[in-house]
């Protein structure tokens, strides 16, 4: 179990600060929730049984919300799928859904629970926010009736959406977000387009998206670049994948790369590798939690800056390829070999010596590493790897990755496979790459899945370097680039109304064109 602590003195300080009207910082909370799951069934349960299960989960969330408020938290994020779990069909999830209105309707469900039909879950969540004077983000399912004569309307007459809601300190619904990038969620529909949802508070502007959304330009990058949000609220049901995509590793890197606060609440389910929540700032993690040993939930709190981009403590813009494109490449090793991380083919070269300078390239991406180990463990092998291309089985997202990583064994065929422990410490490392994208996320992961706050930094010229001498034993040091403009076209793992419409139009036009050719 990995947990960084939250000192009570911070809560006291924040309360005093708020009393004198300062809004430069606030206390945030996230809760990692071990979801009480429904019994496995292929037939829908009754609406009453669905509500009973959701209330069991809300009972647990209520305790966390009250504890967070008592410690001075102004806002709390709870996880994706926290009320009922994740394994459903369209039919079996339906009893759990409510009609969630647009926040423009000016609604406090706690005071008017029947205004939009049967909405007991929304009413209870609203009351929890109101009674504890805290902003609450929760994830639940939204259902929207549609006209059966509309070709995009599903057979049951409803669009169904994976949805985040936010209630303010008065219990008012202030934000609603429908997840766009679904991941193996046949129970839900894909919205017509990515929604760009923000809301303002006395302690900053907030944006919202969910889980798999974080890998794409919309909505996340647009919220930061065009809507200038200070903090992202991020509920997720994240399954950890070593070596590059553990929750705490990638989420802390995203916050640093984008220059915003990221409040992450993950579900907790060890058998599915679901754990890893945190409160991340642009200069590193404030608090995080990773626990693969217990089935317990965890409340995390930390003070964060309300407007991190305006703080002098945070770095200025990085030119990610400035250093790598101006230096003379280090000697490219003759023994470069091919290996895989998940399904992605990397070019690797081994770190044979205790210290050195290495370059490994793949197509247009060259990765440069300077390093010095304190002592090279004989039973551990490290490699420098490069990958540029469309990622994974779906081949949707274009990645550019430079990574220093420990191989699972001394057999080079195991390089890129998951490994959780290491003994080798590095006195110095400097990693850079000839990235074609400005969106690069710096990752450092230590033995037993620890982060390394305050032990590394990104220089303005794009180098990821260690600070203050040696680090803990290293699992990975990576620069994870996303080249969004090279992504392939796709539809998410749900039902996209617009995608179906465009496909039908395209087929119709092709038929007309062929008919015209035949007539000629």
Swiss-Prot record:
GO biological process: pantothenate metabolic process
Main location (coarse class): membrane
Active-site residues from the entry: 80 (proton acceptor), 179 (proton donor), 211 (nucleophile)
Stated name of the protein: Pantetheine hydrolase VNN2
EC top class, as a word: hydrolase
Record-level GO cellular component terms: extracellular region; plasma membrane; side of membrane
Cleaved propeptide residues: 494-520
């Amino acid at each position: 179990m990995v947990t960084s602590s939250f000192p009570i003195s911070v809560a006291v300080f924040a309360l005093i600060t708020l009393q004198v009207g300062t809004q430069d910082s606030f206390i945030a909370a996230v809760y990692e929730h071990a979801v009480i799951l429904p019994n496995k069934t292929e037939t829908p349960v009754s609406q009453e049984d669905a509500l009973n299960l959701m209330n069991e989960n809300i009972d647990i969330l209520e305790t966390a919300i009250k504890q967070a408020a008592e410690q001075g938290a102004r806002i709390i994020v709870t996880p994706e799928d926290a009320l009922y779990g994740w394994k459903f069909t369209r039919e079996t999830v339906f009893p759990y859904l409510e009609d969630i209105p647009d926040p423009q309707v000016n609604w406090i469900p706690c005071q008017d629970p029947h205004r939009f039909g049967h909405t007991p879950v929304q009413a209870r969540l609203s009351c929890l926010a109101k009674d504890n004077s805290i902003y609450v983000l929760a994830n639940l399912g939204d259902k929207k009736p549609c006209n059966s004569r509309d070709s995009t309307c599903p057979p049951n007459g409803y669009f169904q959406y994976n949805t985040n809601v936010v209630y303010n300190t008065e219990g008012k619904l202030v934000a609603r977000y429908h997840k766009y990038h679904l991941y193996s969620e046949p129970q839900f529909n894909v919205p017509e387009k990515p929604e760009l949802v923000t809301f303002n508070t006395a302690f900053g502007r907030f944006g919202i998206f969910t889980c798999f959304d974080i890998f794409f330009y919309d909505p996340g990058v647009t919220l930061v670049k065009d809507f200038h949000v200070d903090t992202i609220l991020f509920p997720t049901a994240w399954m950890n994948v070593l070596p590059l995509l553990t929750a705490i590793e990638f989420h802390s890197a995203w916050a640093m790369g984008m220059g915003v606060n990221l409040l992450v609440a993950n579900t907790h389910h060890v058998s599915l590798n679901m754990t890893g929540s945190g409160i991340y700032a642009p200069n590193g993690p404030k608090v995080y939690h990773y626990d693969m040993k217990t089935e317990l939930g965890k409340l995390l709190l930390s003070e964060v800056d309300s407007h991190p981009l305006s703080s002098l403590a945070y770095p200025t813009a990085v030119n990610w390829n400035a250093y790598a494109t101006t230096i003379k490449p280090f000697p490219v090793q003759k023994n470069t070999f091919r290996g895989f991380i998940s399904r992605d083919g990397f070019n690797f070269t081994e770190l044979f010596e205790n210290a050195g300078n290495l370059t490994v390239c793949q197509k247009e991406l060259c990765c440069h590493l300077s390093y010095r180990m304190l002592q090279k463990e004989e039973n551990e092998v490290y490699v420098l790897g490069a990958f540029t291309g469309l990622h994974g089985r779906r081949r949707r997202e274009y990645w550019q990755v430079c990574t220093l990583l420990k191989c699972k064994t001394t057999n080079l065929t195991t390089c890129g496979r998951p490994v959780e422990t290491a003994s080798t410490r590095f006195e110095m490392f400097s990693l850079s790459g000839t990235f074609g994208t400005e969106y690069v996320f710096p990752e450092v992961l230590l033995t037993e899945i620890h982060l390394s706050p305050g032990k590394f930094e990104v220089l303005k010229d794009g180098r990821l370097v260690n600070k203050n001498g040696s680090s803990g034993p290293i699992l990975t040091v990576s620069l994870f680039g996303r080249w969004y403009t090279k992504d392939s076209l796709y539809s998410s793992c749900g039902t996209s109304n617009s995608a179906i419409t465009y496909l039908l139009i395209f087929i119709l036009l092709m038929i007309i064109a062929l008919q015209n050719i035949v007539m000629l």
